[in-house]
């Protein structure tokens, strides 16, 4: 990138002028990560100061049985496979209540697209979880799952959302987005939910007063232009509804090759190289610069590792997600040493170590507690990372 274009982009960002598709592609083509990160950090600081948000949450994957065989997914199992499972509602409640003593504030629920599980299982699950943990927010189901519920129930998405909200739903999850462009999507997704239905369902959720996240799966067969177009579709929908709270870039993971049954389900692995730390940081920075109307950008440390997550906080991210606990979807495709859980104190240390002030939030980004920032004795930079 020549110096003149750099100055032009810097001026647009500092004037609060909206970046274009061409600007986004130019940013991805830049090899000056320090400059790009610094520019994104300006925007991040303007929006969120020196704060890094986190929450105390537990992920529940109540079934891994799925009709789809998406090319990136190691989580799904077919009916009858030996490690296929479906939890009883009582079991899901027991697992959730096990974290009650840790001041749990959110349950994050995502499942496979089970072919025979009745629709009523899902609102009943939410009702039981809400009854057992009335102070805990329920963030549940991707737009893909809602679309699946339409198929198995005969109800409309509007009717489904109404029933789920009555049962305690406070937010959808942001999954099922992957990459929206059909040029890529046709090769990685094996279900019927594409941009038209994904956006329809999130628009409906926003109309009903729900705030939702949005995601992007990157680092597989897509190109930077696909990432830019993905963000711009979401930005346009956000202009319309204002319902997205946070954008979450998710790094595609290669397969955990020693699966219990010896199978490698992650079909993209042979065709791809995992995104490097530098590519991850560039993706966070460009996302923060392009997605000017979303308040928050989250680094999901489970899919990036804690060191990359710390550095992402200097490249546009202002949220580190939470304690997580047993995120099966990624850990069925990850053998790279990322922990399965971080406690509150771990998160506080990581955030302070990166030079920021931790703020614990709930699902709605309401502040639960503000913590002191980094102390003078901390080292000057996060742990070194291989990029």
What are these regions (language model features)?
Residues 35-79, 84-110, 172:
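N-terminal pre-triad scaffold of radical SAM enzymes
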Residues 1-34, 94, 100, 238-387:
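Auxiliary Fe-S-binding modules of radical SAM enzymes
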Residues 96, 123-127, 161-162, 199-202, ...:
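Generic structural signal for well-ordered alpha-helices
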Residues 16, 40, 70, 109, ...:
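Conserved, mostly hydrophobic/aromatic
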Residues 57-59, 80, 110-120, 182, ...:
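Glycine-rich, proline-tolerant flexible connector loops at the mouths of alpha/beta enzymes
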